[in-house]
Amino acid sequence: MFGLFNRSTGKVINVNDIDNLIGKINLIDIREAYEYRSGSIKTAKNIPMGELLESPEKYLNKDKEYHILCQSGARSARACSKLTGLGFDVVNVSGGVGSYVGSKRK
């Protein structure tokens, strides 16, 4: 799609390039619940990073692609690295909610 691939970080897309993908992608906000409640991006499902990494098979299907989002892109990059290593198809949403200027905020 619009993501670019970098060997060291895997698939990455800038948060401000996802507006036209909202509703068509599996978007997961890995921030803590209190952070998520303060605002996220429409259709993002909240699964805190600790829970997701503890039991990824509980939340993710290896046959689907997931876009992983956090506040700045740092946590999502770490999570994507671990999830990719486990065989999941993930895209890091760089910049995170903190950099998002699109119209799909909730």
Question: Which role fits each region the language model picked out?
Answer:
Residues 69:
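Short, surface-exposed ligand- or partner-binding patches at beta-edge/loop junctions that are enriched
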Residues 1-16, 21-25, 33-65, 74-106:
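Rhodanese-like catalytic fold shared by cysteine-dependent sulfurtransferases
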